């Protein structure tokens, strides 16, 4: 047997046929998937930024609105000297405050007992007290009687504040009415002073 019959026959470009086929890159095969994912991420980021900015605007508006509304006047008000009005009882442990100290133990109500109906409007309370309406006369009489009977000697104006020149009874009744409400406006504060 001749060995030349068993020689393999190679095609001309056999080396080129055996070279590995170049596989496409990851980006070229998944190009559309990657682009869609990037677009979705950008949309999500834009939506989140919009939501957080609107929340910040709402929070800023709420804080600004809270700055306009006044809190309980007793929280920040500094009184020169506080003594209970005639006709009210001092609770146990209540002390008189001095300058620089907030009022801590105040009576449940600063208004003397009267026969007039209680109103929550500081404007009408102030008008009734200023004009000396029928309820104001009986209130003055009952206050004088109870002051002579049970109260020790007090200064002429027991409720003097650092910031106002109004009489004590007008200021305290208006502030007491404001204290019973939850929100206040500039007009309410002006009416109480």
From Swiss-Prot:
Organism from which the protein derives: African swine fever virus (isolate Warthog/Namibia/Wart80/1980)
Protein name: Inner membrane protein p54
Stretches for region Disordered: 84-126
Family, per entry: Belongs to the asfivirus envelope protein p54 family.
Record's keyword terms, sorted: Apoptosis, Cytoplasmic inwards viral transport, Host cytoplasm, Host cytoskeleton, Host endoplasmic reticulum, Host membrane, Host-virus interaction, Late protein, Membrane, Microtubular inwards viral transport, Repeat, Transmembrane, Transmembrane helix, Viral envelope protein, Virion, Virus entry into host cell
Induction or repression: Expressed in the late phase of the viral replicative cycle.
Function noted in UniProt: Inner envelope protein involved, through its interaction with host dynein, in the intracellular microtubule-dependent transport of viral capsid toward viral factories. Seems to induce caspase-3 activation and apoptosis. Plays a role in virion morphogenesis by recruiting and transforming the host ER membranes into the precursors of the viral envelope. Involved in virus attachment to the host cell.
Residue stretches spanning the membrane: 32-52
Cellular localisation: Virion membrane; Host cytoplasm, Host cytoskeleton; Host endoplasmic reticulum membrane
GO annotations of cellular component type: host cell; host cell endoplasmic reticulum membrane; host cytoskeleton; membrane; viral envelope; virion membrane
Membrane topology: Single-pass membrane protein
UniProt GO BP: microtubule-dependent intracellular transport of viral material towards nucleus; symbiont entry into host cell
Sequence repeats: 135-138, 139-142, 143-146, 147-150
Top-level taxon of origin: Viruses
Major localization class: virion
Region annotation Interaction with host DYNLL1: where it falls in the sequence: 159-171
Subunit structure: Interacts with the host light chain cytoplasmic dynein DYNLL1; this interaction is critical for intracellular microtubule-dependent virus transport toward viral factories.
Residue span of region 4 X 4 AA tandem repeats of A-A-A-S: 135-150
